[in-house]
């Protein structure tokens, strides 16, 4: 009986250790990304992968305002010819607004993302979903037909 008790306690402690380790790795990665920010001529240079990682992290933690302001800042920093990156950022902003149930604003950002990258499937899917949510079934059907 005592051995069973020790096995159960060990399993629970292993689970707790795993969760703590995952949190520490996430915090370490976030600190490393923040330390890699280099100010260059009043602009902040940060790789697209890091920005999208931070976006996913903020969305996972439901820090919608942080995510939106960070992405808006980097949209203003991007050169005009980088439309794919801008489209991804607009898509993420639309997802944030959709998560806080501001559907009209989310639709606006999904449309901006669609104008920049009309061939991306996940952007089309998000746009169709927001059309459904808003009640614009006609446009939702058009987008769904494009998806298939």
Curated annotation (Swiss-Prot):
| Gene that encodes it | ycf37
Record family assignment:
Belongs to the ycf37 family.
Q: What is this protein called?
A: Uncharacterized protein ycf37
Species this protein is from: Gracilaria tenuistipitata var. liui (Red alga)
Q: Where in the cell is it found?
A: Plastid, Chloroplast
Matches recorded under Pfam families: TPR_8
Q: Name one GO cellular component term.
A: chloroplast
Q: Which UniProt keywords apply?
A: Chloroplast, Plastid, Repeat, TPR repeat
TPR repeat ranges are 87-120, 122-148
């Amino acid at each position: 009986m005592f051995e069973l008790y020790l096995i159960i306690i060990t399993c629970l402690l292993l689970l707790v250790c795993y969760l703590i380790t995952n949190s520490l790795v996430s915090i370490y990665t976030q600190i490393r990304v923040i330390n890699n920010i280099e100010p260059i001529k009043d602009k902040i240079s940060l790789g697209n992968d890091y920005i999208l990682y931070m976006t996913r992290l903020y969305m996972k933690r439901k820090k919608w305002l942080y995510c939106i302001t960070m992405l808006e800042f980097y949209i203003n920093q991007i050169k005009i010819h980088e439309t794919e990156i801008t489209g991804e950022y607009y898509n993420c902003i639309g997802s944030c607004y959709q998560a806080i149930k501001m559907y009209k604003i989310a639709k606006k950002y999904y449309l901006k993302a669609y104008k920049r990258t009309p061939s991306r499937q996940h952007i089309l899917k998000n746009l169709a979903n927001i059309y459904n949510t808003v009640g614009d079934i006609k446009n939702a059907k058009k987008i769904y037909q494009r998806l298939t």
